[in-house]
Amino acid sequence: MLISVLKSKISYATVTGKDLFYVGSITIDSEIMKQANIIENEKVQVVNLNNGERLETYVIKGEPNSKTIALNGPAARRCEIGDQLFIISYTQVDPTRENIKPKLVDLKTGD
């Protein structure tokens, strides 16, 4: 048996763009992805702090150091530019495994 646990969390990501007619996904600056240990096409949960919306999508790699956080496709209707997001990924682990340390990136403080 496996359980889902927090793998990575990007806190206080600011929406910089949205493209309603793109196929789908969230575009994230590749440097932020690297800091958070999130890879391209990984499934993530997106939580919008401004309106309480939650959604699941997959990640597209954005230009490095661009600070891009852009929701694409139908997800673009769930946010506005300037909204603050939590972007969360999970992994499956054996429940007997201890000392699982998620990668946390806080864009508000720069940690």
Swiss-Prot record:
EC number, UniProt record: 4.1.1.11
Catalysis performed (reactions): L-aspartate + H(+) = beta-alanine + CO2
CDD domains: Asp_decarbox (cd06919)
PTM: Is synthesized initially as an inactive proenzyme, which is activated by self-cleavage at a specific serine bond to produce a beta-subunit with a hydroxyl group at its C-terminus and an alpha-subunit with a pyruvoyl group at its N-terminus.
Location of this chain's protein in the cell: Cytoplasm
Keywords per UniProt: Autocatalytic cleavage, Cytoplasm, Decarboxylase, Lyase, Pantothenate biosynthesis, Pyruvate, Schiff base, Zymogen
InterPro entries hit by this protein: Asp_de-COase-like_dom_sf, Asp_decarbox
Modified residues (Pyruvic acid (Ser)): 25
Listed cofactors: pyruvate
Cofactor-binding details, from the entry: Binds 1 pyruvoyl group covalently per subunit.
Location of the active site: 25 (schiff-base intermediate with substrate), 58 (proton donor)
Main location (coarse class): cytoplasm
Enzyme class: lyase
A Gene Ontology molecular function term of the record: aspartate 1-decarboxylase activity
Record GO biological process: alanine biosynthetic process; pantothenate biosynthetic process
Gene3D superfamilies reported in the protein's UniProt record: 2.40.40.20
GO CC terms of this entry: cytosol
Residues engaged in binding substrate: 57, 73-75
Pathway: Cofactor biosynthesis; (R)-pantothenate biosynthesis; beta-alanine from L-aspartate: step 1/1
Subunit structure: Heterooctamer of four alpha and four beta subunits.
Protein purpose: Catalyzes the pyruvoyl-dependent decarboxylation of aspartate to produce beta-alanine.
Family the UniProt entry places it in: Belongs to the PanD family.
Name by which UniProt lists this protein: Aspartate 1-decarboxylase
